[in-house]
Amino acid sequence: MVVVNGREPDSRHSDGAMSSSEAEDDFLEPATPTATQAGHGLPLLPQEFPEVVPLNIGGAHFTTRLSTLRRYEDTMLAAMFSGRHYIPTDSEGRYFIDRDGTHFGDVLNFLRSGDLPPREHVRAVHKEAQYYAIGPLLEQLENMQPLKGEKVRQAFLGLMPYYKDHLERIVEIARLRAVQRKARFAKLKVCVFKEEMPITPYECPLLNSLRFERSESDGQLFEHHCEVDVSFGPWEAVADVYDLLHCLVTDLSAQGLTVDHQCIGVCDKHLVNHYYCKRPIYEFKITWW
């Protein structure tokens, strides 16, 4: 007779995938009942599974081989169907997992034959692969679009100081203005600039090839805050202002917001001599409903 031991202290890996022991721990809470919870007076015996396993994943029915579920040892599915844990069954005898089964078929197809999901399912299947701790599937999905492109985008945004904070500020300002004005939308000004210093003086084309020589004490003359709600920049990367604008629209839209923007001019703040700020200013329109 085998006694089900208590849970080991929890330890997590930083890469998002879990070891088999961690997967078992997550499975045990709360999906796996203890011997007492299952209504038994004695410790549970190891559970045996048929060669062909009927599954009920949140109401979606699947059938697969036991060897498919155990294909990769360090996964939650392998731990669940190892025989060491009790898995409840539904009224038809299908083994029940309390999880949305919409994309479980894509997970099974990978376990069966290594097939990868279509591009439009990649994000959703990646979420399922994280839940079931299927490392090989995670690795391949992260080399597919759109996840691969998202890695590149995040590398660029990592150079942007306080990007997430400023993004939240845009949303909060737009919300407050819409509430105060009882309006469907709100507008705000956003400055996006790649370079800290102006390169050419204002309205002096003959000096286009010159840079203003300044001492350290002159630096304060160039330091100012444009009269806008939020500013992004500067940064050192090939990506330009339009790339950052695309990121802003993408991330705001991902929050369910309708976003429009247009350039409404530049900052005309006078700095020194013939030099003006000239940072571009964009008007963002956030529509709430």
From Swiss-Prot:
Transmembrane segment boundaries: none
Record Gene3D superfamilies: Potassium Channel Kv1.1, Chain A (3.30.710.10)
InterPro entries: BTB/POZ_dom, SKP1/BTB/POZ_sf, T1-type_BTB
Predominant cellular place of this UniProt entry's protein: membrane
GO biological process: intracellular glutamate homeostasis; intracellular potassium ion homeostasis; membrane hyperpolarization; protein homooligomerization
Keyword annotations: Cell membrane, Cytoplasm, Membrane
Cytoplasm found in the keyword field: yes
Region of interest called Disordered, as start-end residue ranges on this chain: 1-42
Domain BTB span(s) in chain numbering: 53-141
Function: May be involved in the control of excitability of cortical neurons.
SMART domains the record matches: BTB
Cellular compartment(s): Cell membrane; Cytoplasm, Cytosol
Listed name of the protein: BTB/POZ domain-containing protein KCTD7
GO cellular component: cytoplasm; cytosol; plasma membrane
Subunit structure of this chain's protein: Interacts with CUL3.
